[in-house]
Amino acid sequence: MTELKKTPLFDLYEQYGGKVIDFGGWALPVQFSSIKEEHEAVRTKAGLFDVSHMGEVEVTGAQALNYLQRLVTNDVSKIKDGQAQYTAMCYENGGTVDDLLIYRRSEDQYLLVINAANIDKDIAWMEKHAIDGVSITNVSNQTAQLALQGPVAENVLQTLTEEPLADIKFFRFVDGVNIAGVNVLLSRTGYTGEDGFELYCLAEDAPVLWKKLIEAGKEHGVVPCGLGARDTLRFEAKLPLYGQELTKDISPIEAGIGFAVKVDKEDFIGKEILKKQKEQGAPRKLVGLEMVDKGIPRTGYEVYVDNQKIGFVTTGTQSPTLKKNVGLALLQAEHSELGTEVIVHVRKRQLIAKVVATPFYKRGN
């Protein structure tokens, strides 16, 4: 059996009561207290996540912008220094290689943040399409990433830095910020549907940064959070998870992130199919389902109308915020109208559900 990969914070998990599981070959905490408590803390106060398993790749050189424009679906020429952009890499058939964030440091320096399970595959894909004048460097092992998410995140973080955090707007970042004596790339981004920050630092600095953030957040109700709450939070906000809402067989248009696909820019991998899907409508659509009958729609459960299979559940749970059994499902587009009644095959039972609006949770609602 191969040994699980560990983040620089692994030794701290036990100290904070973390329950460790195998997550795609990584030893990561699924929870510290309980998923519901951690979820609630992020929605009302704030939570601190270790997301150091994510991959970081530097793309540099005179041709970096041209290279990225061909590699990804969004228009990288639209971001300025200090801005971040959400985007995807696709195959020629429109299926998704990965979804990712791009940070622009300068015209010839970018940092890409990719999903942990896809690091090797993504880098191989990037190298396969590399051009002269571009360097691709995997800095994942020397980089740690923490996420402080929730309504009090800014107040807590401000006690540890002189950087005016209110000036860092959503999807903006500042490199070289001193937070509690640690040098951090600080980004106003996240994967929870809440306000918050993602903090990138050297792996060896991560434990001290984690401790300082927990300490500073104590009186504000900040708690350590695991992967379980990260998943329920992102699910309520309809943020896709690679391997569920996005796969090599599911396009960004189908998954509802068409805003990150700019078909009017110059040629990029997958453009032809994605342009067609955007203009004529994709054959499938990601929708929300709410159970009418009692049961929880889990990943992979099949969905039917009139005894015909029309799709499957990508993610489902009892929403901690709504207290309802809900799911995201990829359905044939003609069955995606709000209010449509469908049958979800939950184990051996056939249960009624209806198509509902998403996201299930929006900040400020």
Curated annotation (Swiss-Prot):
Keyword Transferase: yes
Keyword Translocase: no
Top EC class of this enzyme: transferase
Record EC number: 2.1.2.10
GO molecular function: aminomethyltransferase activity; transaminase activity
Reactions mediated catalytically: N(6)-[(R)-S(8)-aminomethyldihydrolipoyl]-L-lysyl-[protein] + (6S)-5,6,7,8-tetrahydrofolate = N(6)-[(R)-dihydrolipoyl]-L-lysyl-[protein] + (6R)-5,10-methylene-5,6,7,8-tetrahydrofolate + NH4(+)
GO cellular component: cytosol; glycine cleavage complex
GO biological process, one term: glycine decarboxylation via glycine cleavage system
A Pfam match: GCV_T_C
InterPro entries assigned to the protein according to its UniProt record, in alphabetical order: GCS_T (IPR006223), GCS_T_bac (IPR022903), GCST_C (IPR013977), GCV_T_N (IPR006222), GcvT/YgfZ/DmdA (IPR028896), GcvT/YgfZ_C (IPR029043), TrmE/GcvT_dom1 (IPR027266)
Keywords: Aminotransferase, Transferase
Function recorded in the entry: The glycine cleavage system catalyzes the degradation of glycine.
Subunit details: The glycine cleavage system is composed of four proteins: P, T, L and H.
Family: Belongs to the GcvT family.
Protein name as annotated: Aminomethyltransferase
Organism (species): Halalkalibacterium halodurans (strain ATCC BAA-125 / DSM 18197 / FERM 7344 / JCM 9153 / C-125)
Chain's gene name: gcvT
